[in-house]
A protein has these predicted regions:
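Flexible hinge/capping segments at coil-to-helix
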Residues: 60-100, 104
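A late-sequence structural motif
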Residues: 10, 166-210
Length: 213
């Protein structure tokens, strides 16, 4: 099971690389936000998960897979290019611009809310015009001028390269978050599930898989 960002931009490459090593491997990839993936893990619907937020360290093993960062995505137009030329950071635009938000329960939303608290702000202070559970739909809305959004740098990499979107670092030190591989502490994995976990915990194998995404 995988939450939205790893499920779209990381896990397919990981599983494809593992399948080359283990041709008999078969899997079903279930999607949800980070909270839903935790629930699926606890209920036994999945044995291995990928999430962008830690919520139950007493019951769940979290292995850091990927260092992601969150950026403020904006349309590539004259208005936002002027901010870029002035060296403006994303946090300076959060309270000023219409905002398209991820759904509550997503790792991205959790990371953003934690970040806002460090600034003495809350999500309620943003000019939220929509809550959307799909980064691809959010990117379309942002490029169409609906507002700005805080998204994974992974999610907007292609659009930034082709000039559809601009990506602003949130502040000088960047807003980082970790994508985790999760398993239940109390669960015994099958032989193939354990092989997958061991494969993903190998840094050089993981890097090769990430290059396929």
């Amino acid at each position: 099971g995988a939450s939205t960002v790893p499920g779209q931009y990381l896990v397919p490459g990981y599983l494809a690389a593992f399948l080359k090593c283990e041709p008999e491997f078969r899997y079903s990839l279930r999607r949800g936000d980070s909270e839903q993936v935790h629930r699926m893990l606890k209920s036994g619907q999945i044995a291995v998960g990928f999430v962008g937020a830690v919520s139950e360290p007493e019951n769940v093993d979290y292995f850091p897979l990927y260092d992601d960062r969150l950026v403020l995505a904006a349309p590539n137009n004259e208005h936002y290019r002027a901010f870029r030329e002035r060296g403006v950071y994303g946090r300076e635009l959060l309270l000023e611009e219409p905002f398209v938000s991820r759904e509550e329960g997503s790792g991205t939303d959790t990371s953003l809310q934690n970040y806002l608290r460090t600034l003495g702000l809350s999500h309620d202070m943003l000019h939220v015009v929509a809550r959307v559970d799909d980064p691809e739909a959010i990117k379309q809305m942002v490029s169409g001028g609906v507002g700005v959004a805080v998204l994974s740098a992974l999610a907007v990499e292609q659009e930034v390269q082709n000039g559809t979107l601009l990506a602003f670092e949130m502040d000088k030190s960047a807003l980082k978050r970790t994508i985790y591989l999760i398993t239940l502490k109390s669960q015994q994995l099958s032989r193939m599930e354990q092989k997958l976990v061991d494969f993903l915990k190998s840094p050089h194998r993981r890097k090769r898989a990430e290059a396929q995404n």
